A protein has these predicted regions:
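Single-stranded nucleic acid-binding surfaces, predominantly the OB-fold ssDNA-binding core
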Residues: 1-81
């Protein structure tokens, strides 16, 4: 169902640790998924754009909780491999 097509780890002390491209059901490619180090550990963030209001808005939103969880697990597993 999910495949991490590409994962690019970043060096340095930034909270941003990696970018990933994820294929969903062999039909959709989501580029720019991010792995971020937060205060509670690593988490996965969907691609975002900054609006004219200065706020960040997701470009792609996963509506199914199981799909969100599967995407997070797949990306973090690829990051930790």
């Amino acid at each position: 169902m999910l495949e991490v097509a590409r994962l690019h780890k970043l060096n340095g002390d930034s909270a941003l640790k990696a970018f990933a491209d994820v294929v969903i059901s062999g039909q959709m490619l989501v580029k720019g998924v991010r792995v971020v180090e937060g205060k509670d550990g690593l988490f996965v963030s969907m691609p975002q754009n900054q609006g004219k209001d200065g706020k960040w808005h997701e470009i792609v939103s996963l509506l199914d909780d199981e799909l969100k969880q599967a995407l997070q697990e797949a990306v973090l597993e690829a990051f930790n491999a």
